[in-house]
């Protein structure tokens, strides 16, 4: 099938690779290069980098609302466009241009977690499961009818990065199935009940309040890992906590217990991966070797 691909971050790359292997990708649309790193040099998106490695033409318009951009898009003569974490709103002329419309790969069980951060929000909310939906796009935010859906369990120690990688691979597999069965799929309108929105993650959500229950702090650490990274102050230094599990232990909220376990309002969490500023992530034994925490140490955020 003759396709346009529209995506930008790492999550989109496996989908691009799968489509390139099985279909004709006539053009790749992604966000333009932006300043990044210490030198603030323009850095292309992961999708642009991979598309160029594959020899695919790349476009990164700052808007798709101009008549010129819409004419260029339509002139590609694609049968369908596949969209995954692209980063721009698609106006109606773009949605209407491909013969079979635009298909979106969304990382949640719609209508739950429409919007920008569905993977983070599913873990933060303590959802038992999530999944991938292939959706026929329309003008609303993730409101289109669902063509195909697959569920997956969220593991008790799974982080955003873990789930991100699994769902990315699932999306690549599912879109191939959807494209192959497009003539037979029946669009299923999303129900009005159960709609929730996955707002962008704010950095203010990352500071840990140790008076909260262990179950909530466990979800906060896993649901913000690796970015922006839940953090606490230890010995006056900000430390990111990247992996954890709920554990037994008693003490005042924030008390550091043996083995880098920290007491919460109720229960405790065992930190299994931590990162000091300017350092790489470390497991507890290595972390404590270079950053000993004397008996009576406390974790806090202010």
UniProtKB/Swiss-Prot annotation:
Region of interest (Disordered), ranges: 276-302
Binding site for (6S)-5,6,7,8-tetrahydrofolate: 108-111
InterPro entries xref list: Fmt (IPR005794), Formyl_trans_C (IPR005793), Formyl_transf_N (IPR002376), Formyl_transf_N_sf (IPR036477), Formyl_transferase-like_C_sf (IPR011034), GART_AS (IPR001555), Met-tRNA-FMT_C (IPR044135), Met-tRNA-FMT_N (IPR041711)
Reaction(s) catalysed by this chain's protein: L-methionyl-tRNA(fMet) + (6R)-10-formyltetrahydrofolate = N-formyl-L-methionyl-tRNA(fMet) + (6S)-5,6,7,8-tetrahydrofolate + H(+)
Role: Attaches a formyl group to the free amino group of methionyl-tRNA(fMet). The formyl group appears to play a dual role in the initiator identity of N-formylmethionyl-tRNA by promoting its recognition by IF2 and preventing the misappropriation of this tRNA by the elongation apparatus.
Family (UniProt): Belongs to the Fmt family.
Name of this chain's protein: Methionyl-tRNA formyltransferase
Organism listed in the record: Cereibacter sphaeroides (strain KD131 / KCTC 12085)
